[in-house]
Amino acid sequence: MTPAMHLAAPAGNVPHIGFGHVWHTRLRPRRHRFIVPTFFLLLPMRTLRERPEAAGVLALNRAGALSFRDADHGGGKNPRQGGALAWLETLLQAEGITDAQGEIWLQCYPRVLGYSFKPVSFWYCHRQDGSLRAIVAEVNNTFGERHAYLLDAPQYGQELRARKVFHVSPFCPVEGGYRFEFKRSGAQGLHSTRVRIDFDDAQGPLVLTGVAGRLQPLDAASRRRALWHYPLLTLGVIARIHWHALLLWAKRAPFHRKPAPPTQPVTRSSTPSTPSKPSL
């Protein structure tokens, strides 16, 4: 796959599930690294709005072992208020992006046994011809705050940059910026996906993170696999955040007090950089 390549929006507009892993490496002042298995969803949001029955085995805006609720995203809108998709479409319109009229796919963690925490979700916004128009990285912190990073005119395999303005961890300052890279493989991009998010402070690269996985349609078998292997996915995410925070504190990583949240809900990406740099 070349950096300049556009992938069409995934065909077969049904929910998909990805099984893979999350990685996190802190480079300073002492190296700290972990890799954990995970799973995530890839949802065709416009299809689900028009045909909710396309959700299949996914409990859509209702209770279920594996579920998705619109109110967990964006402005917290329920389906009667237009849902999460209405928030995303309003955001794009406000930012002058009017040609993302194709499918919008959301990569996110589901609710598992009713519990949800979504550190970051990715909205892939396509034109009617299937080409990728924008990506929105929707970030949540443990204080119940949310911020969106709009990556304009992205290309798969190309590094994109955005200034960091939102508090996520007390061990990372709100300064510097992020470097994003998105990759897809296979027919229509439905074999695997890989997202890299690296954070640079004033001294250079500090934290290298990402999530990758192989995709397959969400059906009874893949749902059963997810619930059997990861029954405590959400609680595990929250527990790991606090456990690794304790380890960083023990390693004397600098502690930064939480600043006030940004006054603007959206930060737009700066000019993309090319070529992409590999993660360490």
Named regions from a protein language model:
Residues 1-280:
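Mature, function-bearing regions of proteins
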